[in-house]
Structure formats: C-alpha cells, structure tokens
C-alpha cells in the first residue's frame, strides 16, 4: 500500500539532502530545527567560526524551489544581522516521477531538484 508523505516528512526529506550538502562543504552543526515554518532549520559555523543561518524550503515540483518570499527574507536577514550570522537558502523541489499531480510516497522513488545553497546578501534593502 502506498503511503503519501506528510508535509513534515517532505520537509525532513529536504533537510536530509541539505544537511548532507552542508557536511560535505565542511560546516559544523550548532543547532538543527526540523519543525515546519520554524526558521532557521540549521545553525552552522564554518572553519573561521562564522555563524550561518540556513533556511530550507521544500516545494512540490513543478514549483520553482529557488524562489523565496523576498519581503519575509528581509525580516529574517535583520534577525541574522542581530546575531552576526550570514544567511544561506536551500530550496528543494520534490515530485513523483509518475506524474506531478501524484503525491510522493514513502519508500518509493522521487524526483528532486536541488541547485545547492544560495548565499543571501544580508544588507537590508
């Protein structure tokens, strides 16, 4: 029986992909938050002890995972500046290979669109 992934499970799947990418890039995890709509998902530091707030956003394909709410991001950038952190954005698109109207199922193949981490300039607009 096919069991469709919940929004939280889709979010966790996206976070797993991004977390592996962050590890490969040499980031050290300070905090991880996997709750939906709770930001940032990752607080990391690099080898120079610079803090990074990482936002992970999952969308269902064909929606573009690289797009984000610019107005909301301004508020988040302010939060990062107050904490001497830089902002990274990771958009992840997931889809069912058998059709974009079908859900993504547990333990089944899925499509992924992930173009890596985007550095978000923290200068306020």
Language-model segment annotations:
Residues 1-32:
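Acidic-basic catalytic patches of nuclease active cores, encompassing PD-(D/E)XK
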Residues 33-34, 91:
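Short loop/turn and capping residues at structural boundaries
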Residues 36-40:
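Short acidic/glycine-enriched loop/turn segments that link adjacent beta-strands
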Residues 43-55:
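Active-site beta-strand-loop-beta-strand hairpin of nuclease catalytic cores
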Residues 66-85:
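Short, charged, amphipathic alpha-helix that recurs within catalytic cores of restriction-modification
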Residues 86-125:
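Domain-level recognition of nuclease-like catalytic cores that cleave nucleotide substrates
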């Amino acid at each position: 029986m096919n069991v469709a992934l919940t929004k939280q499970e889709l979010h966790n799947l996206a976070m797993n992909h991004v977390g592996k990418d962050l590890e490969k890039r040499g980031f050290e995890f300070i905090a991880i938050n996997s709750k939906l709509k709770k930001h940032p998902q990752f607080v990391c530091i690099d080898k120079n002890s610079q803090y990074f707030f990482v936002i992970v956003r999952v969308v269902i394909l064909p929606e573009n995972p690289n797009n984000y709410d610019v107005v909301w991001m301004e508020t988040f950038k302010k939060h990062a500046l107050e904490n001497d952190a830089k902002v990274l954005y990771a958009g992840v698109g997931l889809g069912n290979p058998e059709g974009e109207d079908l859900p993504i199922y547990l333990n089944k193949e899925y499509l992924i669109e992930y173009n890596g981490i985007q550095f978000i300039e923290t200068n306020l607009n």
